[in-house]
């Protein structure tokens, strides 16, 4: 089974910066977002030198589910993490999550996932691994791998706020509401009764390079910057971690550092974690 260690080792051994030259126009990949997602898949299956048939077999071997643009997650590793891939076009911009708040853990009973995802394998919950790529034109400038449990608060934090807003909207007098999973849906607003209003939440979250700037800073003179943060509990569960340790020892541009990160539910508490950082040369 593949995991984050395999992906990081593959990235260090195969640093690809130009997504356009590598992916666009091939295999129905027509935009940078799709190219980034395919790149992430290739990291987990070591798929850069595989032909399409070999790649399909590797996907089947390592992934139980590949998703769509409407429902999380983007992919699930067999017996492993759920993965969400997010593209950012500006180095410091926030990430739009649209109508769903961040999830620390993905559960099989989540109303956000598809029936196919729920039955893709025998599972109850999965760690959520967010993969953030900063893309400038055709080039991948930075990539971050961060587990949501180290990045987002418990679901109750977001759900409580959402329900308070929803309740407040529904107490407005003189309008006709209809049941909805959104914050509100109001019917027949105008005299003809032909206009409706949907009230939707639009969630944003700061990108991880800003959130974790107290333990990692990008060097903008580099053509490519990479960071991954893995809490110690997860790190100890990764049985192939020695493979990455050995690779980093022989890679001048890579480092493995012990750090302390803030608990997303209580920033007064710190937890031990590993920071993996890597860079590629000077930018042109």
Protein language model regions, located:
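Nucleic-acid endonuclease domains
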Residues: 1-72, 87-284
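Short acidic loop-to-beta-strand element that houses the catalytic metal-binding Asp/Glu
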Residues: 69-82
